[in-house]
């Protein structure tokens, strides 16, 4: 089967410099959703028709299995498909999809393709309570589809029809090519309508069949930011419903955003206003606090993420406790039972089991052993303005509050750094290292007094 995806539209109502099909829905471009669904059908040829912003669309797709055709002038859907016909295999049918209709399920498309077979024309239709703006499906007395009439070309009788065209169709490729060659733009829009091939098929006696989606939202398209926002909420609601059915506890299913792939184990609890981006895995018993953002990360069994945390490209070990207000940056790997507390930032660091940094610390480019205590105000000084250097803190070390570790530097096993230390040389294991000025009390010192302003 050939699949042609129409993605050439300018999207004027989006009021954006970004091509319409590149606007994100649940974290990825509209067109990417359509391509993902198309690939599940294993097409022999997959062609994307581009036009406005074509170079940016090609760059986004960036896949060797996808061919492109260009529609330089926006002269309608029929004209768009004409640009792709030379790349199609005539021995198999062609399915036409739309880059701004992202949520049509593969099962629905398979049903349409199955109903059409190799020699019928198949149309995906839907019944709408308010069909305004859609092409109407016109049937004869026997219920056979005879034509599709666009809104601007419809008479009063046709406008009263509630069965509408979704634009998605499948038909024999050789027939499609011949019908496209006969299309006219003599209509209110001055465009070449793909839907006119229905009338051509009927006149030639080609059987026309139809299929229907299970849900109306499968056929909804995007022509404005309003419609994009509506579709985002619909898709998020569907994703939340699936999570609930899979056994995840959502404190409020209406207040979760999944912008990628979220995989959850058993007894996972997710509080309100959490955002999951990219590929995120939450193992058994994980609890995610409110207002947390997690991107491309794995949270292992029994870990708890307290509210207002930000975790990106990091791994959190089993039974660890993160937050509130903690940030784990790319390259962070935490072993089991690690505590990262409020206003602690960890970047590109490995922290072994049972270690803690409970308050106000920066741990960057560091290797931290087991059972290490990192006091409040500790900073690994990893950057000299040009290069990054690593800090190594071995097992059972104790880092006092307000300590600066100027990398490259090593803290030995069981070593203690006194509060306020600025460490520039390795600290030996099992010993106390302190570097700060001796405390002095000046008896005769007087605090300056502000002078009162006259007048």
UniProtKB/Swiss-Prot annotation:
EC numbers: 2.7.7.23, 2.3.1.157
Pathway linked to the protein: Nucleotide-sugar biosynthesis; UDP-N-acetyl-alpha-D-glucosamine biosynthesis; N-acetyl-alpha-D-glucosamine 1-phosphate from alpha-D-glucosamine 6-phosphate (route II): step 2/2; Nucleotide-sugar biosynthesis; UDP-N-acetyl-alpha-D-glucosamine biosynthesis; UDP-N-acetyl-alpha-D-glucosamine from N-acetyl-alpha-D-glucosamine 1-phosphate: step 1/1; Bacterial outer membrane biogenesis; LPS lipid A biosynthesis
GO terms, molecular function: glucosamine-1-phosphate N-acetyltransferase activity; magnesium ion binding; UDP-N-acetylglucosamine diphosphorylase activity
Protein function: Catalyzes the last two sequential reactions in the de novo biosynthetic pathway for UDP-N-acetylglucosamine (UDP-GlcNAc). The C-terminal domain catalyzes the transfer of acetyl group from acetyl coenzyme A to glucosamine-1-phosphate (GlcN-1-P) to produce N-acetylglucosamine-1-phosphate (GlcNAc-1-P), which is converted into UDP-GlcNAc by the transfer of uridine 5-monophosphate (from uridine 5-triphosphate), a reaction catalyzed by the N-terminal domain.
InterPro entries recorded: Bifunctional_GlmU, GlmU-like, GlmU_C_LbH, Hexapep, MobA-like_NTP_Trfase, Nucleotide-diphossugar_trans, Trimer_LpxA-like_sf
Annotated region (Linker), positions in chain: 226-246
Binding site for acetyl-CoA: 376, 382-383, 401, 419, 436
Residues spanning the signal sequence: none
Binding site for Mg(2+): 100, 223
Catalytic activity: alpha-D-glucosamine 1-phosphate + acetyl-CoA = N-acetyl-alpha-D-glucosamine 1-phosphate + CoA + H(+); N-acetyl-alpha-D-glucosamine 1-phosphate + UTP + H(+) = UDP-N-acetyl-alpha-D-glucosamine + diphosphate
Binding site for UDP-N-acetyl-alpha-D-glucosamine: 6-9, 20, 71, 76-77, 98-100, 135, 150, 165, 223, 329, 347, 362, 373
Protein name: Bifunctional protein GlmU
The UniProt record lists the keyword Membrane: no
Keyword Metal-binding: yes
Subcellular location: Cytoplasm
GO biological process, one term: lipid A biosynthetic process
Cofactors required: Mg(2+)
Coiled-coil regions, chain positions: none
Family: In the N-terminal section; belongs to the N-acetylglucosamine-1-phosphate uridyltransferase family.
Domain of life where this protein originates: Bacteria
């Amino acid at each position: 089967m050939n699949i042609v995806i129409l993605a050439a539209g300018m999207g004027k109502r989006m009021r954006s410099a970004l091509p319409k099909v590149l606007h994100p829905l649940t974290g990825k471009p509209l067109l990417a959703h359509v391509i993902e669904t198309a690939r599940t059908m294993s097409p022999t040829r997959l062609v994307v028709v581009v036009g406005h912003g074509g170079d940016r669309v090609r760059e986004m797709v960036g896949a060797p299995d996808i061919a492109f055709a260009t529609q330089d002038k926006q002269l309608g859907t029929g004209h768009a498909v004409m640009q792709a016909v030379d790349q199609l295999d005539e021995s198999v049918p062609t399915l036409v999809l739309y880059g701004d209709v992202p949520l049509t399920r593969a099962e629905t498309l398979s049903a349409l393709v199955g109903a059409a077979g190799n020699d019928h024309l198949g149309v995906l239709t839907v019944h709408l309570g308010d069909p305004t703006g859609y092409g109407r499906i016109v049937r004869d007395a026997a219920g056979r589809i005879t034509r599709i009439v666009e809104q601007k070309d419809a008479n009063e009788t046709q406008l009263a029809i509630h069965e509408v065209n979704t634009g998605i169709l499948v038909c024999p490729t050789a027939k499609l090519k011949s019908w496209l060659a006969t299309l006219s733009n003599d209509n209110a829009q001055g465009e070449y309508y793909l839907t006119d091939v229905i009338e051509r098929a009927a006149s030639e006696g080609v059987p026309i069949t139809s299929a229907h989606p299970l849900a109306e939202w499968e056929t909804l398209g995007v022509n404005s930011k309003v419609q994009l926002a509506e579709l985002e909420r619909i898709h998020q609601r569907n994703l939340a419903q699936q999570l609930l059915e899979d056994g995840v506890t959502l404190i409020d299913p209406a207040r979760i955003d999944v912008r990628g792939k979220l995989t959850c184990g058993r007894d996972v609890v997710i509080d309100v206003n959490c955002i999951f981006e990219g590929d995120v895995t939450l193992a058994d018993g994980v609890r995610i606090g409110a207002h947390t953002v997690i991107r491309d990360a794995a949270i292992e069994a029994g870990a708890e993420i307290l509210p207002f945390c930000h975790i990106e490209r990091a791994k959190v070990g089993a039974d660890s406790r993160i937050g509130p207000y903690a940030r784990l940056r790319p390259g962070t790997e935490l072993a089991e039972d690690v505590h990262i507390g409020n206003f602690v930032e960890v970047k590109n660091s490995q922290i072994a089991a049972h270690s803690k940094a409970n308050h106000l610390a920066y741990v960057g480019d560091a290797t931290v052993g087991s059972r290490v205590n990192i006091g409040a105000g500790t900073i690994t000084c990893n950057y000299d303005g040009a290069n990054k250097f690593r800090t190594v803190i071995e097992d059972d070390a104790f880092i006092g509050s307000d300590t600066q570790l100027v990398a490259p530097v090593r803290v030995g096993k069981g070593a203690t750094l006194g509060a306020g230390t600025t460490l520039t040389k390795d600290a030996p294991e099992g010993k106390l290292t302190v570097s700060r000025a001796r405390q002095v009390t000046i008896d005769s010192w007087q605090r300056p007094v502000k002078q009162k302003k006259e007048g």
